[in-house]
């Protein structure tokens, strides 16, 4: 009896990684663009950005040019308003019953009272007791006052403990404008009487002279005031 021959087809053993083989790779130049194409793409992007920036700049320039006439018109209107304001300031006048001299208005009271009451009355009129600027202004007031026999308080007072004459704005008396040579007593206030300036007790009853300015000026501009 012939022995049966059995042949087994032997297959080589599979390695562990053989079950997960990677797909075959594509050719190197299958999905790559030529270098010249990439350069053209970059240049196109740069050109597009430059175009957008240029359009934005032109739109801003057009807007400025459109608004320029309006800005110039506003400037002209502002200048006209400033000129009108200047003209109005030049036409300011003193209130009725006030004396006008240079850039000041003066009011002579019709009643008599103490120096302090005169100060309060002037303040209620939006003014102050008279502050003499120079000899010319003093001469104008002396010539304008008809009642030569009366005394009129002004904004000058003898202060303690300084023992000095001071205007109500705090500046000291300038002797080039006014000179008070008499011995001064405590609690003395200055008054215009006749053709000179005298001093009396601040509690005396006198009329007074108020002043206000037509234009805004700082009191430091007055040469009649010391510092």
Swiss-Prot record:
Keyword Transmembrane helix: yes
Keywords: Disulfide bond, Lectin, Membrane, Receptor, Signal-anchor, Transmembrane, Transmembrane helix
Transmembrane regions: 46-66
Motif (LCK-binding motif): 31-34
Membrane topology: Single-pass type II membrane protein
Subcellular location field: Membrane
Cystine bridges: 94-105, 122-210, 189-202
GO cellular component, one term: plasma membrane
Topological region Cytoplasmic: 1-45
Domain C-type lectin: 93-212
GO-annotated molecular function: carbohydrate binding
Pfam families xref list: Lectin_C
Residues exposed to the Extracellular side: 67-227
Tissue: Expressed in natural killer cells.
Predominant location: membrane
Gene3D superfamilies: Mannose-Binding Protein A, subunit A
Keyword Membrane among UniProt keywords: yes
PANTHER family: KILLER CELL LECTIN-LIKE RECEPTOR SUBFAMILY B MEMBER 1
Function: Plays a stimulatory role on natural killer (NK) cell cytotoxicity.
Subunit comment: Homodimer; disulfide-linked. Interacts with tyrosine kinase LCK.
Protein name: Killer cell lectin-like receptor subfamily B member 1A
UniProt organism field: Mus musculus
Gene (name only): Klrb1a
């Amino acid at each position: 009896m012939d022995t049966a021959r059995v042949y087994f087809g032997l297959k080589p053993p599979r390695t562990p990684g053989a079950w997960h083989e990677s797909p075959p790779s594509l050719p190197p130049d299958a999905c790559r663009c030529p270098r010249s194409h990439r350069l053209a793409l970059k240049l196109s992007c740069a050109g597009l950005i430059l175009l957008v920036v240029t359009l934005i700049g032109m739109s801003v320039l057009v807007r400025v040019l459109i608004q320029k006439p309006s800005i110039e018109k506003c400037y002209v209107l502002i200048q006209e308003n400033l000129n009108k304001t200047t003209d109005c300031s030049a036409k300011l006048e003193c209130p009725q019953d006030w004396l006008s001299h240079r850039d000041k208005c003066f009011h002579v009271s019709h009643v008599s009272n103490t120096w302090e009451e005169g100060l309060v009355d002037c303040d209620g009129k939006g003014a102050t007791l008279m502050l003499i600027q120079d000899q010319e202004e003093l001469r104008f007031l002396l010539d304008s006052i008809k009642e030569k026999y009366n005394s009129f308080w002004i904004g000058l007072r003898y202060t303690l403990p300084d023992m000095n004459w001071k205007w109500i704005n705090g500046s000291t008396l300038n002797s080039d404008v006014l000179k008070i040579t008499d011995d001064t007593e405590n609690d003395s206030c200055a008054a215009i009487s006749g053709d000179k300036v005298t001093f009396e007790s601040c509690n005396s009853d006198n009329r007074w002279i108020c002043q206000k300015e037509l234009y805004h000026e700082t009191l430091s501009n007055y040469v009649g005031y010391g510092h």
